[in-house]
Amino acid sequence: MDFVMKQALGGATKDMGKMLGGEEEKDPDAQKKEEERQEALRQQEEERKAKHARMEAEREKVRQQIRDKYGLKKKEEKEAEEKAALEQPCEGSLTRPKKAIPAGCGDEEEEEEESILDTVLKYLPGPLQDMFKK
């Protein structure tokens, strides 16, 4: 019967004791092996990061060659120039630049009101039109 149980369970009988709360076998070199494994993982990670940095440097070099060839600017440089242009006041102008004026502000509303008033005045008889225009 013992033979049949061992064959049915395979090598799981050794692990059964561990699963039921028994003590694990103590490996005298387990801590040393774990440290070696951690060191190997750390080295692999460093190598991966170094490889990634080299590849990114090569890509940036190619990007810069393309920018130089076609006279393009980096996105950050372009944004900085646009921002500086907006902040710099126009020479001889006492007003803000048009882009700095928020939408809905300014003379647009007054023009709409005047056009509505003009439309209403057109439908009034002549003497009333004269009264409202004064």
From Swiss-Prot:
It holds the Pfam family Synaphin. Keywords: Cell projection, Coiled coil, Cytoplasm, Differentiation, Exocytosis, Mast cell degranulation, Neurogenesis, Neurotransmitter transport, Nucleus, Phosphoprotein, Synapse, Transport. Nervous system. In hippocampus and cerebellum, expressed mainly by excitatory neurons. Down-regulated in brain cortex from patients suffering from Huntington disease, bipolar disorder or major depression. Down-regulated in cerebellum from patients with schizophrenia. Residues 15-85 have a biased composition (Basic and acidic residues). InterPro entries: Synaphin. Residues 1-114 are annotated as: Disordered. The modification Phosphoserine is found at residue 93. Residues 28-84 form a coiled coil. GO terms for biological process: cell differentiation; mast cell degranulation; modulation of chemical synaptic transmission; nervous system development; positive regulation of synaptic plasticity; regulation of exocytosis; regulation of synaptic vesicle fusion to presynaptic active zone membrane; synaptic vesicle exocytosis. GO terms for cellular component: calyx of Held; cytosol; dendrite; glutamatergic synapse; nucleus; perikaryon; postsynapse; SNARE complex. Residues 41-97 are annotated as: Interaction with the SNARE complex. One of its GO terms (molecular function) is syntaxin-1 binding. The keyword Isomerase does not apply. It is found in: Cytoplasm, Cytosol; Presynapse; Nucleus; Perikaryon. Binds to the SNARE core complex containing SNAP25, VAMP2 and STX1A. PANTHER family: COMPLEXIN, COMPLEXIN-2. Negatively regulates the formation of synaptic vesicle clustering at active zone to the presynaptic membrane in postmitotic neurons. Positively regulates a late step in exocytosis of various cytoplasmic vesicles, such as synaptic vesicles and other secretory vesicles. Also involved in mast cell exocytosis. Belongs to the complexin/synaphin family. This is Complexin-2. It comes from Homo sapiens (Human).
